[in-house]
């Protein structure tokens, strides 16, 4: 019985591994970056909404990390949509490059403004709410136009 279970588990794991995105492909690279951005953003939002304790130094570091991450995924969107693999990006990403790039720049500006807000002392979570909301709004704007749900 154990052998059957082990064989079944091995087969399932092998099949699951076959369907993944190549982590070195442009799609794999941007998915990794977007997941990191989401995790950092959720932590920042959690601190401001009371879901997580507000830790000033962690917030400052995470805001800087988010700003850094925000500048990296765009290079992994090739000019022409790559073949193969499932992507949540709509075809509009490649058909409306100027608009996509404009939203990317808005996102970068919003994270830069959040970092700037972390330099004001004493650091108060209430003073960070509006800059963080702009970051979240810029994410949402791009998702609404260019992400297939």
Where is each model-derived feature located?
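Bacterial N-terminal signal peptides that target proteins for export
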Residues: 1-7
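C-terminal motif of bacterial Sec signal peptides marking the signal peptidase cleavage site
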Residues: 14-17
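Sequence context surrounding c-type heme c attachment/ligation sites in exported
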Residues: 19-56, 64-149
């Amino acid at each position: 019985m154990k052998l059957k279970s082990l064989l079944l588990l091995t087969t399932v794991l092998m099949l699951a591994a076959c369907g993944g995105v190549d982590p070195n492909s442009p799609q794999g690279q941007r998915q990794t970056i977007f997941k990191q951005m989401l995790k950092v953003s959720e932590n920042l939002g959690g601190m401001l909404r009371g879901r997580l304790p507000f830790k000033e130094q962690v917030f400052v570091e995470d805001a800087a990390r988010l700003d850094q991450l925000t500048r990296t995924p765009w290079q992994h969107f090739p000019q022409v949509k790559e073949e193969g693999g499932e992507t949540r990006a709509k075809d509009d990403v490649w058909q409306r490059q100027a608009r996509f790039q404009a939203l990317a720049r808005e996102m970068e500006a919003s994270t830069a403004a959040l970092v700037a807000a972390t330099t004001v002392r004493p650091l108060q979570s209430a003073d960070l709410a509006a800059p963080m909301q702009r970051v979240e709004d810029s994410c949402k704007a791009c998702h609404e136009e260019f992400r297939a749900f």
